[in-house]
């Protein structure tokens, strides 16, 4: 920024959008309506390719209005990812994950996809089939068909969650078979689709007592992202922890950070700053999303820190 002009060097349209956000945030208007910008050079780029939030908490899901406002906030804060996975949406999880959304909810998904695009945010729709999935060709096609329904609503980014389940649905080899099928028959065949994301059943180090993660590492298509919460469900993110899991899954993990989520302490508002994030760990992850509170506006304080970190 010089007295004569503003030069912007970008690599894509998202970069231009972010540059505009920076200029708007720097602009100052005096009492006479004159707007000024500080002079200087600004170098602004992310440390993590995919960064934002995962609506993955237990409790009342955000309202449609909450989600629209959140997407606008993410654009301003230069976060490019919103993963839709509210645990209490019956069409995301059981009992209705096999079924299409009703007309009203389908229209809202379309609205969210449109608003996300306007704010340069990837709207990622997640399915959570593990509570009652049958490892049959019929249910394999049910997942594929549900992805097709969401694609027709405008969704271009997808995730499959196998968290917080037990029994038949928690088998690593069966999960990998399904995910590899989706990768081959949907992700690679549909136009404009982003890499597939999965949340494993053993999603933190404290629970990783079997060969589950090793099976995923060996058998899962390397293009598929694998999520991870750290050394426990709620934990600091450290370089040592990232290196441990990355070796097991044979790829950089996609961090699901459980802050400021408060579904384990519902009588609290977690509005402090984000902390416990090792800046040296950012290069050892493929993505970083925070799980917020069911109180959307109150979550913005911590999410600001997430944007600053990533």
What are these regions (language model features)?
Residues 2-146, 152-156, 188:
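Feature activates predominantly on carbohydrate-active enzymes
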Residues 28-31, 57, 146, 153, ...:
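Catalytic-core regions of glycoside hydrolase
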